[in-house]
């Protein structure tokens, strides 16, 4: 496996109709994090952001990741300050990537520099493992057992 394939639909940003879900991460270094997600997950960088506050926009498979340095408060978030996780072992949320072949993704992404906390482990009807990114965020990678249905 040399690439993770996704259907041929487009996921536009900004969307021309309806909406698109994106995930925002506060990072210490936008360039470093952008290159990490580009290299490990074959992300397509649309914009590298700037020092005026514009975030990095990266398309990863069928979703968008926005990266920006911390700060605040701002007029639209008057009581909120954004920062990277102070303790990478105490997090309140994480990204979850569902894959068709976890072993292939594990080998490919590890060869591209992903730091896995463990190898894939079978648990609750799926195999899963976690990656830690350069800012300490974790990313779950999971493959459901055959026959598992959602909904």
Language model features with spans:
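Short glycine-/small-residue motifs
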Residues: 140-141
